[in-house]
Amino acid sequence: MNEHRGYYAIIPAIVRYDNHLNGNAKLLYGELTALANEKGYCWATNQYFANLYNVSKRTIISWLKQLEERNYIKMQIFYK
């Protein structure tokens, strides 16, 4: 993806030092919170993140599940 937003992502210590999360899930958390700060919620799709990090949607879903299982995020799925 050519366009990268110019904002800071802050990852709280509780997330950074959680040994149940892999490093990429922690990085994704920072991206999620940065996007949520922009509009009050994270509007991006799984495909958006897959393109951003050059991984599959399945990988993004795995990272999101890690974050949800540890209660760092709550997901609502919207279908078009």
Could you describe each region identified by the protein language model?
Residues 1-59, 65-72:
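Short recognition helix of helix-turn-helix/winged-helix DNA-binding domains
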Residues 77-80:
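Short, Lys/Arg-rich nucleic-acid/phosphate-binding segment
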